């Protein structure tokens, strides 16, 4: 598609139409590439969430086995705060706990809150990825349609030129 300029200046309606079709194809391609980059970013975040979920489940199992509490890693807590995800705010003795006053210790049941929140967020990311993939498919369809239109216009123009050259 980068060869749109290589068609040069022309007055043939077919070639002008072909150039327009190629420009539209380039635009569709650029839009698809933008969504592909967004999908790559979302997939990386989805992997990060999956890793955090695995760690949280391991910590929940440790808390269950010991009958006590395990500590939420700082990076998990930061991620959850950054994305407004819920986790248990229970603290020792604070009547209205906040994220600032909450401890990072969770028993087996308290881990459920964080795990469910991460799972819901992971599903949201998955839905977002699927939606963006539909957009990519749409832009790819547009790209194919525009390039086929350009090819048809060029072939039609060439047939006309050939007929003129033969004197038909």
PLM features: what roles do these ranges have?
Residues 130-168:
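Proline-poor, low-complexity alpha-helical tail modules
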Residues 13, 20, 121, 134-135:
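Residue-level detector of alpha-helix boundaries and kinks
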Residues 25-28, 32-35, 39-56, 60-63, ...:
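Long amphipathic alpha-helices with heptad-repeat character
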Residues 53-89:
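Extended alpha-helical coiled-coil "stalk/arm" regions
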Residues 48, 75, 110-113, 117, ...:
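Exposed alpha-helical structural elements
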Residues 84-126:
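Extended, non-globular alpha-helical segments
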Residues 43, 47-51, 103, 156-159, ...:
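Extended interaction regions within the primary functional domain
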Residues 1-37, 150, 163-168:
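Short, compositionally biased, intrinsically disordered N-terminal export/targeting signals
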């Amino acid at each position: 598609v980068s060869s749109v300029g290589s068609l040069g200046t022309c007055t043939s309606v077919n070639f002008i139409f072909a150039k327009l079709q190629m420009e539209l194809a380039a635009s569709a391609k650029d839009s698809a590439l933008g969504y592909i980059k967004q999908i790559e970013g979302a997939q990386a975040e989805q992997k990060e969430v999956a890793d955090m979920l695995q760690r949280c489940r391991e910590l929940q199992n440790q808390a269950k086995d010991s009958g006590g509490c395990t500590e939420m890693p700082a990076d998990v807590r930061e991620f959850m705060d950054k994305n407004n995800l819920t986790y248990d705010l229970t603290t020792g003795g604070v009547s209205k706990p906040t994220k600032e006053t909450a401890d990072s210790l969770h028993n087996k049941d308290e881990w459920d809150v964080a795990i469910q929140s991460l799972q819901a967020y992971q599903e949201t990311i998955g839905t977002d990825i699927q939606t963006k993939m539909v957009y990519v498919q749409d832009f790819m369809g547009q790209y194919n349609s525009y390039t086929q239109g350009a090819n048809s216009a060029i072939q039609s123009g060439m047939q006309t030129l050939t007929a003129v050259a033969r004197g038909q």
